[in-house]
Amino acid sequence: ERWLHRMRWANVMGKDRPQLVISPLNATVGNGVRLTAFEIPADPTKDRWAPTILNGEMNRMHNHWHLDVDGDAVIDTLTASREGVHLIRRTTAGWGKTKLGSGITADDPNQSGAGEIKTGRLKGGGMFITTVEPMHGHSLVVYTAPDKKGALWNRHVVDEGFRRGHALWTADMDGDGSDEIVFGHSDTPEVPGVNIYNGLDESGEKWEKHVIDAGGMATEDLVVADLTGDGRPDIVAGGRATHNVKLYVNTK
C-alpha cells in the first residue's frame, strides 16, 4: 500500500492473537482504500502475513480506532474518512459497515468527513466518539449515541477555528470517573498547541476548555500515559514545525 498511513494491533478477526490493522490514506486499487488486517504468521520474519480486507469503499481514511462497541466480546473498528464516521465489524456474513455520522459537509469532498477519531466515557458512563473534522481540520467534534436504533449519532461541535487539528486522545485526566478530550493542533497562527476539554454533563453537549500550551507545540501527535508513576495520566506531545517533544505532567 503506497498510501499506508495508520496501523494498530487489534484482534478484529477473533483469533488467538491480534492482527496488524492498517488504513491507507488514498486508494490505489478500486474506488476506496483497503482497510486490511494482517495475521501474524508462524515465522513473522519469513512467512507471508495473510491479509483480510475489512472494507474497500471509503476514501481519505486518515485514522481508525479499535474497541468492542456493542459489548459482544468482539473487537470492532471505527474509521474516520472523507465519508464520515463508520463502524466496521465482523458478522456471520462477512464484514459489515454501519454509518454513525457524516462528519462535516462541504462543497469540496476533500474538505468533508472526519480525520482523527477516539472514544471515551461521559459522566454517567455513556460512550462518546470524538473526531477532528475534516481531515487536518478546524473543528473538534463529539458524537453521542442516538435514542432511536439505527439513526445517525448526535453530532456536537465542541470547539472550532483551528488550523490542522492533528492529535486526539481521551483519558480521565482529573480522576472524576469520566474522560476528558486531549486535542492538539499544529498550524493555528501564533498559538498552535494542546488543549484539554472537560465534559460537564451526561449528554456530551457541554465542555469546558483548558489551554495547556499556546504557541509552544505545533502538535503532530500526542499520547496520554502515566509517565511519572504517580497514578495520574500525563501528556507527551511532539511538534513537527516546532521541532520539539514535551512532557506535560499532570498535577491534578
Each model region followed by its residue ranges:
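Beta-propeller-forming repeat regions
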Residues: E1-K252
